[in-house]
Regions:
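Hydrophobic helical h-region of N-terminal Sec-dependent signal peptides
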Residues: 6-10
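N-terminal signal peptide c-region/cleavage motif recognized by signal peptidases
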Residues: 15-17
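N-terminal secretory signal peptides
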Residues: 20-70
């Protein structure tokens, strides 16, 4: 019985919601789900999971420096950025997904060119 209680305690830790904090303000970043992303955002996230190919190969997958300090502080090179196509835009537009970590599993969506981010919960 003691082991069962311990197992449930450990499982409860994994069920807790993930939060990310703005490195500059220390406020929790808002979250979004994959389903709430625009279609183009879901498409970009699928390409990230597949490893490409990306429509903006020269820029997609490049290092995101987090100069604005809106994402949690991490070592240089931790974050990579990817373009989320904007219908009707002649350039890359303002929408991006920024992912971090070795397997690029910690991802954030911005619709306003890095001013604000939402943690994507999968």
């Amino acid at each position: 019985m003691k082991h069962l209680a311990m197992l449930f305690s450990v499982l409860a830790l994994f069920a807790m919601p993930v939060q990310a904090f703005d490195a500059g303000t220390k406020k929790a970043l808002p979250t979004t789900t994959v389903a709430e992303l625009p279609k183009e955002g879901r498409d970009t996230l699928a390409l990230i999971r597949k490893g490409g190919p990306f429509p903006y190969a020269a820029k997609d997958g490049s290092s995101f420096s987090n100069r604005e300090r809106t994402l949690p502080k991490q070592p240089r090179g931790y974050y990579k950025e990817y373009t989320v196509k904007t219908p009707g835009s002649r350039d890359r537009g303002a929408r991006r997904i920024v992912c971090g970590g070795k397997e690029q599993r910690e991802c954030y969506y911005t619709a306003d060119h890095y001013k604000t981010f939402k943690l994507i919960q999968e």
